[in-house]
C-alpha cells in the first residue's frame, strides 16, 4: 500500500546514515517533492517512461531540492536520452522490462556509450561477487542490488560475500 512507502522510507532514513533512493515509477513532479519530504537523497527516473524533456525538468527539480537523480536506461536510445537530459548519474537496468529477461552484459555494453565523468550504475541481475568484479573491471562505478539480497536468508552474510571482490 501507498502508506507503507511513506512509513518504510522514513523508518529506513531514521535507521541508517547512508544515502537512500526512492526507487519508484516517478511519473509526476509531485513524487519528487514527496521523496524529499520522506528523506530520500536520490530518485530514480526511468527513461523508458519519460521523454528527454521531462527527464530534464525532473532533474532540475531534483537539483533545486538537493536530490540526486539516477536516470535509468536499458538500451542505447534511452542512454542517449539520459545524457541529452544532462544526467550526471546513469543506471543501466540489466532486466528487460518488456520480457523480464536479465543480462548483466547489458551494463558492460552500454558503459562504452556513457562518458567516464558520468557515474555509471549497473542495476538488476547481479547475483555474485564475480558479477560485481566483472562490472567493476568494465568501468562500472556502482551496483544496485535488490532481489539477490532480499531472497537471501542471511542478508548480512550475502552483502559481505558480494563485497568480497571489490
Positions of the model-derived regions?
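Acidic/glycine-rich phosphate/pyrophosphate-binding loops and surrounding catalytic core
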Residues: 6-15, 21-22, 28-37, 42
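Glycine-rich phosphate-binding active-site loops on the catalytic face of alpha/beta enzymes
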Residues: 34-54, 91-100, 140-158
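Short, small-residue-biased leader/transition segments that mark boundaries at the very start
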Residues: 1-5
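Catalytic cores of alpha/beta
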Residues: 27-39, 76-85, 122, 126-145, ...
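Catalytic beta/alpha-barrel core
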Residues: 18-28, 41-52, 65-79, 91-101, ...
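C-terminal helical cap(s) of enzyme catalytic domains, especially alpha/beta-barrels
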Residues: 109-113, 136, 151-166
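Charged helix-capping and loop-helix junction motifs
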Residues: 6-10, 103-109
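Glycine-enriched alpha-helix->loop->beta-strand junction motifs that scaffold or abut catalytic
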Residues: 15-18, 37-43, 63-67, 84-91, ...
